[in-house]
Amino acid sequence: MANIINLWNGIVPTVQDVNVASITAFKSMIDETWDKKIEANTCISRKHRNIIHEVIRDFMKAYPKMDENRKSPLGAPMQWLTQYYILKNEYHKTMLAYDNGSLNTKFKTLNIYMITNVGQYILYIVFCIISGKNHDGTPYIYDSEITSNDKNLINERIKYACKQILHGQLTIALRIRNKFMFIGSPMYLWFNVNGSQRRMKAEREIARKNCGGNPCERELKSERSNVKRLEYQLDAEKEKVKFYKRELERDRYLSSRYLTSSSDPHEKPLPNYTFPRIKNVSPLTTEATGSVEVAPPSTDVTEPISDVTPSVDVEPEHPPAF
């Protein structure tokens, strides 16, 4: 069995039959998870990850013999990147034709913006990989570019393909708000690609597209508006509390004043209470300024009352407002 290094270098492996077992397992997995909705905590199980891993490895092993005049002078793995070789790959052919082409038929009905179920997610990402096509339908590398010596061109093509794999999955993750669903891209899509830079760039592009454009920004503005509305309501409630406290103080003040000056010997005054004092006016006199001694309570009153000699600046006959 050829190892990955030999496959990469174009060393032709011993002819092997297509591993139909991995295709059968893949078909069963898709049927099993096709209607399973992706929730916030949904992830791909270890069993299903192993099946995906086997499918991609079997696809890589089955690449056809490369033409001597159709190899990359830059060492790029064109056997997995171009339609010229992928369409000759027996594993790819078998996968598309399996079960009367049911998998390929389902794949053609999907796009990155409508995926909501686990089976749809797995089928779409895996078929994009083994078909050598980006999510926008363009090939990883055009057949005419197989023998290109333009290093920048080939590197940019592969970087774009790698970005599309990350971009598509990040788009789904942000839309569904799930951070556990992910299928890693095969190693040949990382040819001359800086992984950390590519990941950060893809995340920035997704954030700019989704949050700077529509849904995230609208949700954020809505949340900010709700917070402001609640703050206004809280301030209004605080003002109400202050108002009721002032009213309570005023009522207690008036009650104490009239009770302490009452001639009814059986009327019980309020308990001792210290009133706010405002300079130069007494509410118990007809003078604009001055103070009045409050008469002591009736001797029949059992509870003592302290002298009240408020001095406030208000008109006579009218209590002060607090």
UniProtKB/Swiss-Prot annotation:
It holds the Pfam family Pox_A30L_A26L. InterPro entries: Poxvirus_A26L (IPR009285). Residues 284-322 are annotated as: Disordered. It comes from the Viruses. Encodes a truncated version of poxvirus A26 protein. Belongs to the chordopoxvirinae A26 protein family. This is Putative A-type inclusion protein. The lineage of its organism: Viruses, Varidnaviria, Bamfordvirae, Nucleocytoviricota, Pokkesviricetes.
